[in-house]
Amino acid sequence: MCKNIFLTVFLALLTGQSYAFTVYKYTDENGVVTYTDKAKAGAQVFVFNDRMVERIENDVKLETRKHAAGETLVLHNQLYAPVEVQLRLENQGNIAGGVKQPVTWVLPPRSEIRLLTLAPADPQQPLQYKAKLTYALGDPRLLPTTDQYPLPWRGGPFRLTQGANGKYSHFTPKGRYALDIAMPEGTPIIAARAGVVVKIENQQTGRGTNPAGNFVRILHDDGTMGVYLHLQRGSVSVTEGQRVDQGSLLARSGNTGNSTGPHLHFVVQRNVGLAVESIPFDFNRPVNSLPNFAVGGE
């Protein structure tokens, strides 16, 4: 027998201080689930942290090449996007001249560079140092050329359930200016701007291990990046390194990762100097807010 399940999610378009905030999950006698910031008898604490986890340490690598004259440090960028890197040498010993300042560089996509060559002050003794590498996706020298974005979906109309500086989850530098739009699972998600697909995740089921769920990250020509999160498993139709046009189908919306209901989490980010942060943007068409939305299914 089919059973209708209704989920009511209270996600007001909140602004104000940027801090984490306690949400209460309450199920009534009819099985209706409500998320609210008001404590109720029988409610459970539900802390929602919608953060994005992208692991790029396997794509940005520091290689040490030893030779008769000393050692050369070679940096590899296997990503389809530039990466800003900073290399510090700590606990230095027996290095001719020493390396007093950190070395900062922007590696082009899919490239490698000989960053430093170190020679020993005493050729009979080994070099001593500890390499500390810091890096961030993107080129901080590029500046955004627009803050107006076409709607990244087909169909609708759909409603905004959480906006910039939202207390439920939009309080970190990476997600402060993100927008959440409630929509049925399976809604076509399209590229808001043309660019190159940098990273995708397509195999996560439910909450999984990544709070972002399934996602697509696209690098735009001005150095900004559009990121589409909580996508339906198996629906991502683009590949890393692929060039896409504005309006190209990317995937279908879902409810994967740290998601309280079916929606698209869309954010625009850029490298602000060894850190990726979200930046303000607007859709070029009005999207009304909806404090409460309900979805039903069988």
List each model region and its residues.
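Bacterial N-terminal signal peptides
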Residues: 7-17
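Short, cationic interaction patches enriched in Lys/Arg with P/S/T/G and frequent prolines
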Residues: 2, 16-119, 124-128
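Surface-exposed, glycine-biased beta-strand/turn segments
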Residues: 103-212
